């Protein structure tokens, strides 16, 4: 999976898909009450990027629904995964549950259209810190209460704050979440990062019987040398400001026979058995 990073303006969706991304990440900015308002990162952000691009969240969902609906004029077959980077660190943890309710209802109304939409992308909920786990509980409760538990099959979770992996496992146990879990490891493209935690996540992913990590990805990669180093470790995906660079690296002799781009037929919740 190649995730286009910080795709917050509607016009950026096609831009990143044209560069080769098959997944996009966008930031969800919430008001103090936990209501999702806009797709927006804000300052600071990655080096060399404009931090202020944005869209109304519901309008963004309306557009991305079309982009991921077969036979729609806007349909782009390659886009199979949407990563919602939830800026919960900007609000009180006490509002995390309210935020989970709101985001779930907005997805029901504007993306899935309560069963009337054929939009098919998988959804990855990126949670910054384990202290905000009530967002996940609320999201699942809302799908159940609204009568759409079936959409749980399309939704995975991911904690992005580089916290202790065992601590994350403990929270997943509390939530009863034993599948559909991704694990991110990374840092802004402005700085270098070692691979110790990334290797630990990959080791846990590959441990027989360990169900708390199905996929591992690294962020935010812009240098080809770092992309190569990361691919050699065996990650499932990378997040990048430059998907075209990732494509070029994947075509190199060292990687061409080991990796391919994920398609809709690849289940993002299953461990890859090479």
UniProtKB/Swiss-Prot annotation:
GO terms for biological process: killing of cells of another organism; lipid catabolic process. GO terms for molecular function: lyase activity; metal ion binding; phosphoric diester hydrolase activity; toxin activity. Binds 1 Mg(2+) ion per subunit. The keyword Disulfide bond applies. Its EC number is 4.6.1.-. Gene3D superfamilies: Phosphatidylinositol (PI) phosphodiesterase. It is found in: Secreted. Mg(2+) binds at residues 25, 27, 85. Keywords: Cytolysis, Dermonecrotic toxin, Disulfide bond, Hemolysis, Lipid degradation, Lipid metabolism, Lyase, Magnesium, Metal-binding, Secreted, Toxin. InterPro entries: PLC-like_Pdiesterase_TIM-brl. Belongs to the arthropod phospholipase D family. Class II subfamily. This is Dermonecrotic toxin SdSicTox-betaIIB1biv.
